[in-house]
Amino acid sequence: MTFDENISRILVTDKEYDMPFSKGLLARSLSAAGMKPSESYTLAREIERDLTEQNVLKISKDELRRRVYYTLINRDYEGIGEKYLLWRRVLKKHSIIILVGGSSGVGTSTIAFELASRLGIPSVIGTDSIREVMRRSISKDLVPMLYESSYTAWTALRRSQWEEQDTKGMHLLGFERHVEPVLLGIESIIDRSLTEGTSVIIEGTHIVPGLMGEKYQSMPNVIFLNLTLSSEEIHKKRFTARAKVSDRPLERYLENFEIIKEINQYIVEKSKENNVPVIENVSISETVQKCLEIVTERFSNLTDEPIDSDFY
């Protein structure tokens, strides 16, 4: 019998079903607890090897978790071990709604998908998609700002509103009017996820703390994160990279870059006013790690439920 054949016979048992042991699932659980992806996969492979050498063909999910926990402790990963147990208690017993906000080009999509992969959250929704749905429901005559980009929405304001604002104020007023109808769709998705007990990550420019309903700020399993980029050079490079893999014109972003900067600063200020973490997204790996730490800390008070999860 080959090594691979032996591994395929290891079953992880639960009350309702059995499933084959998976290094990928275990590595993802360890990664969510804060271990580096390369280290988490190495440890998962070692645990797989130990089970094989001990001729373990069936193991309960609880016993596997104990093995993983004590392996972490013995390797001086005590902090990760505690977080690992925390996530095992929380996942699948509480829906997780993570809102990743930030202006155009700061990297909300990339971070959202990385978090989804680490946490095993199957659904990532961009607010641009929600905006498209809202456009089908609201006519252009009623809310013309909705039919513009976040940084050109000011051009759809009435002339009388132009006269009441300075240039920056006009840009931000247009942005707010653009965001408001999209927030209705975002809040509807959050409400449905909470009702159905499903987890989701929503990302995009339209997530602005202080403009959303106050009730979401106090919910322990609705977590706001704001990304920013202080470096203009890095920010512009992100637009250049985006233009290479999509049909979004680089020139349009660069022409409106000063307005995008104003919107970025506005979102940062609103985040600080509402005690939402602001994360400098220069390094993807460091940003993901920081986000995981914030999410883990937020869930540290939700540990009274019995452990049950599709993760190991």
UniProtKB/Swiss-Prot annotation:
Its EC number is 2.7.2.16. The keyword Nucleotide-binding applies. It catalyses: (2R)-2-phosphoglycerate + ATP = (2R)-2,3-bisphosphoglycerate + ADP + H(+). One of its GO terms (molecular function) is ATP binding. Coiled coil: none annotated. Residues 8-95 form the ATP-cone domain. The keyword Nucleotide-binding applies. NCBIfam families: PRK04220.1. Catalyzes the phosphorylation of 2-phosphoglycerate to 2,3-diphosphoglycerate. Involved in the biosynthesis of cyclic 2,3-bisphosphoglycerate, a thermoprotectant. Belongs to the 2-phosphoglycerate kinase family. This is 2-phosphoglycerate kinase.
